[in-house]
C-alpha cells in the first residue's frame, strides 16, 4: 500500500503531512511555505489556489473565495450562512436543493467542489515531495462537524482524486501529534482548538500498555461557526465605523476597499499577538471631489481584546460541558494543548490558563499539529505504524422523530465509534401499514430544532392495532462518523435501509461529474504548465541570442543575422499561441540558426582572453576619472 497522507483542511490555512522514518513531516508547498491559504480565485481561464490567489484578492474580491469551510454541508437558510452573506465579498447563492453554494464568474459551485481545489494542491505538494502518485488521505474536520459536513468533506476529497481513508477530528489528530512520542505515560489532556472558522474542545485519555498507546476521546463540544474570521470581522467593522466617523464615508459598498481593510485587519490582529499597538495605514482607500482619502488608525492590543472578549469568553461554556460529559473536573486534566492559529492571541491563552489553572504546553505547533496527527492516523491505516489505537466519538446525539414531534435518541453524543445500536418502535395508529423514519442529529427535545439528516419509508407492515407491530430501527455509525440506518418489521421481516450520504447536497452523479471535471482540468492544468515552461525557455533563448548579436557586432555576416532575426520573429509569434510543440520547435529553430553566431562569440571571447595576457593592465575607473578631469574645466559659478 502506498503512503497515506494527512491533510488539515482548514478554514483559513491548510497543511499536508506524511510519515517519514516513523516521524510525521510537514511538507512545504511550491511557494516554500509549510501552510497554504485556503483561498481559491477564478480569473479569466485560470484557477489560482493558495498564496497566488491571496495576492490578487484585492483586485478580484468577487471571484476570490475564502472561508468556504464555513459553508460546507450547510443549507442556504441556516442562520450562520445568512450572517456570512452579509459580510462576504463573494456571492453566496441558494442551490436547487436548498444548500448554500457560491457563485464566481457566473458559475454556481458547491462548497465541496471548491474545497477540492485546495485538496488537489495538498495532493500535488505531497506527490512532488514523495516522487510518487498519492491516492489515499486522512482528512481532518472539526470535532463538532455534523454528518452533512463530514460527508461534504469526504466528497471534496473524492472530487480532488483522493480516496479518503478516514475522516478524523482535528483535536484528536492534535492529540496524536502530541502524545505518540510523549514519554509521559497515562494522562488526560484537553485539546482547545480555535481555528480560522471553527472551535472545538475535546477531552482525551491516553493510556499506554506494553508500549502501545490508546487514545480515547471522552467527550467533545464546540461551535462550528466561531473562529479567527469572526475576530477579523469585529476589527473590520470597527475600522469601517471609525473611517466613517472621521471621513463621512461608508466603505462597505466598495468591495475593493473592503478587501484591503480585511487584509490589513488580519495583519494587525497577528501583529498584536506580539506587539502592544500597531498602525493600520491604507493610503488612497477611496476618493471624492475633494481628493483622495486615506485610512490611518492606531489599534492597541487592549482595543482589539475589548472587541473580541465576548467571543473568547463564549468558548468557556463548551469547556465546562465537555468536562461534565467526561465526568471529570479541571483538576483531572494533566495537560492542555492549544491548536489553531487564533490560540496565539494572548487573551485566548490567558483565559484558557485561568480556566484550567495551568499553562498550555508550548511544544505543540498550533498550525501543524493537526496535519501531523492525520499523517500518523494514515500510517496506522496503512500498517506502517502499529502501536497506536484511536477511539473517537460521535459529537452529537442521533435519533428519530417519534409521536408528538419529539427526538428519541438511538445513539447518545460522545459514544465511541464505530458503533451499532438498535431500538424498537411501534405504530401510532390502528392498521398502519407504513411508517416514515425521520433521522435527526442534535441535542434538542423538539424534532424540528435538530438537524434533519434524511428520511425513508418502511412499507408492508402487518395491519394491527396501534402499538402492536414491532419495528426495530438500527443506527450503524462507521469510523468516519458517517451514518447508516435500517428499519425492520420483526413480524414480516420487511426491511428498508438508508446510508446518510448526499447530505453534502450532492448526488452520486454530481460528485462523479465533479470528479471527472477535476480530472479533465488536471490535464488542462498540466498542458498550461507545459506551455508556460516552453514560453519561459523561449524567452531565455531570445534574451541570450539578442545579447550575442550585440557582442558579435560587425563580425556577424548580414545574411546570418537576417536568418536569425527571421527565426526570432517566428518564435515570437509562436509564444503568443498555446501550442507547446510549435513553441519548442521554433525555439530549436532559433538555436540552429544561431550556430554561426555562437562560433563567432566564442572566437571573440577566446581572442579577448589571449590578448588580455599580453596587453598592459587596463586603467581602473578611478584612473579614468583622473585623466578625464584634466580635460574638464569646471568654473565655480557652474557648480550647483
Curated annotation (Swiss-Prot):
The keyword Chaperone applies. Coiled coil: none annotated. Keywords: ATP-binding, Chaperone, Nucleotide-binding, Phosphoprotein, Stress response. InterPro entries: ATPase_NBD, Chaperone_DnaK, Heat_shock_70_CS, HSP70_C_sf, HSP70_peptide-bd_sf, Hsp_70_fam. Induction: By stress conditions e.g. heat shock. The modification Phosphothreonine is found at residue 198. Residues 602-640 are annotated as: Disordered. SUPFAM superfamilies: Actin-like ATPase domain, Heat shock protein 70kD (HSP70), peptide-binding domain. The keyword ATP-binding applies. Belongs to the heat shock protein 70 family. This is Chaperone protein DnaK.
Amino acid at each position: 500500500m502506498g503512503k497515506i497522507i494527512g491533510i488539515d483542511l482548514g478554514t483559513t490555512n491548510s497543511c499536508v503531512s506524511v510519515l517519514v522514518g516513523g516521524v510525521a513531516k510537514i511538507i512545504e508547498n511550491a511557494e516554500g511555505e509549510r501552510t497554504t491559504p485556503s483561498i481559491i480565485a477564478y480569473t479569466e481561464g485560470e484557477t489560482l489556489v493558495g498564496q497566488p490567489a491571496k495576492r490578487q484578492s484585492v483586485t478580484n474580491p468577487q471571484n476570490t473565495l475564502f472561508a468556504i469551510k464555513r459553508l460546507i454541508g450547510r443549507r442556504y437558510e441556516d442562520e450562520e450562512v445568512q450572517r456570512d452573506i452579509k459580510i462576504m465579498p463573494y456571492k453566496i447563492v441558494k442551490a436547487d436543493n436548498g444548500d448554500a453554494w457560491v457563485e464566481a464568474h457566473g458559475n454556481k459551485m458547491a462548497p465541496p467542489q471548491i474545497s477540492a481545489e485546495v485538496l488537489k494542491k495538498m495532493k500535488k505538494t505531497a506527490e512532488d515531495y514523495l516522487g510518487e502518485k498519492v491516492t489515499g488521505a486522512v482528512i481532518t474536520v472539526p470535532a463538532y462537524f455534523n454528518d452533512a459536513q463530514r460527508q461534504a468533506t469526504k466528497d471534496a476529497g473524492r472530487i480532488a482524486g483522493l480516496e479518503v481513508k478516514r475522516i478524523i477530528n482535528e483535536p484528536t489528530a492534535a492529540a496524536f501529534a502530541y502524545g505518540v512520542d510523549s514519554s509521559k505515560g497515562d494522562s488526560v489532556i484537553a485539546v482547545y482548538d480555535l481555528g480560522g472558522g471553527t472551535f472545538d474542545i475535546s477531552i482525551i485519555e491516553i493510556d499506554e500498555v506494553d508500549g502501545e498507546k490508546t487514545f480515547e476521546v471522552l467527550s467533545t463540544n464546540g461551535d462550528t461557526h466561531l473562529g479567527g474570521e469572526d475576530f477579523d470581522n469585529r476589527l473590520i467593522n470597527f475600522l469601517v465605523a471609525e473611517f466613517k466617523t472621521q471621513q463621512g464615508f461608508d466603505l462597505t459598498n466598495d468591495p475593493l476597499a473592503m478587501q484591503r481593510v480585511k487584509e490589513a485587519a488580519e495583519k494587525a490582529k497577528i501583529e498584536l499577538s506580539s506587539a502592544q499597538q500597531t498602525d493600520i495605514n491604507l493610503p488612497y482607500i477611496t476618493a471624492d471631489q475633494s481628493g483622495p482619502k486615506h485610512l490611518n488608525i492606531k489599534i492597541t492590543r487592549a482595543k482589539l481584546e475589548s472587541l473580541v472578549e465576548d467571543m473568547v469568553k463564549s468558548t468557556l461554556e463548551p469547556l465546562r460541558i465537555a468536562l461534565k460529559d467526561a465526568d471529570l473536573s479541571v483538576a483531572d486534566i494533566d495537560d492542555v494543548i492549544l491548536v489553531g492559529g487564533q490560540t496565539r492571541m494572548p487573551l485566548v491563552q490567558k483565559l484558557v490558563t485561568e480556566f484550567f489553572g495551568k499553562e498550555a504546553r508550548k511544544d505543540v505547533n498550533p498550525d501543524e499539529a493537526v496535519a501531523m496527527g492525520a499523517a500518523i492516523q494514515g500510517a496506522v491505516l496503512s500498517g506502517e505504524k502499529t502501536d497506536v489505537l484511536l477511539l473517537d466519538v460521535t459529537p452529537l446525539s442521533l435519533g428519530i422523530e417519534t409521536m408528538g414531534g419529539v427526538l428519541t435518541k438511538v445513539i447518545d453524543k460522545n459514544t465511541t465509534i464505530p458503533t451499532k445500536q438498535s431500538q424498537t418502535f411501534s405504530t401510532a395508529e390502528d392498521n398502519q401499514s407504513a411508517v416514515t423514519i425521520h433521522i435527526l442529529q442534535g441535542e434538542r427535545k423538539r424534532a424540528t430544532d435538530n438537524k434533519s439528516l434524511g428520511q425513508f419509508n418502511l412499507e408492508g407492515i402487518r395491519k394491527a392495532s396501534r402499538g402492536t407491530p414491532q419495528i426495530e430501527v438500527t443506527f450503524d455509525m462507521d469510523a468516519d462518523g458517517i451514518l447508516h440506518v435500517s428499519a425492520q418489521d420483526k413480524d414480516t421481516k420487511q426491511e428498508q435501509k438508508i446510508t446518510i450520504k448526499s447530505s453534502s447536497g450532492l448526488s452520486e452523479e454530481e460528485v462523479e461529474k465533479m470528479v471527472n471535471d477535476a480530472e479533465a482540468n488536471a490535464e488542462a492544468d498540466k498542458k498550461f504548465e507545459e506551455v508556460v515552461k516552453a514560453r519561459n525557455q523561449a524567452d531565455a533563448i531570445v534574451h541570450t541570442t539578442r545579447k550575442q548579436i550585440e557582442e558579435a557586432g560587425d563580425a556577424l555576416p548580414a545574411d546570418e543575422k537576417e536568418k536569425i532575426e527571421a527565426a526570432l520573429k517566428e518564435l515570437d509569434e509562436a509564444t503568443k499561441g498555446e501550442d507547446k510543440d510549435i513553441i519548442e520547435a521554433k525555439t530549436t529553430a532559433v538555436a540552429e540558426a544561431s550556430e554561426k553566431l555562437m562560433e563567432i562569440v566564442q572566437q571573440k571571447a577566446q581572442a579577448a582572453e589571449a590578448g588580455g595576457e599580453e596587453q598592459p593592465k587596463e586603467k581602473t575607473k578611478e584612473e579614468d576619472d583622473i585623466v578625464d578631469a584634466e580635460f574638464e574645466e569646471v568654473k565655480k559659478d557652474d557648480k550647483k
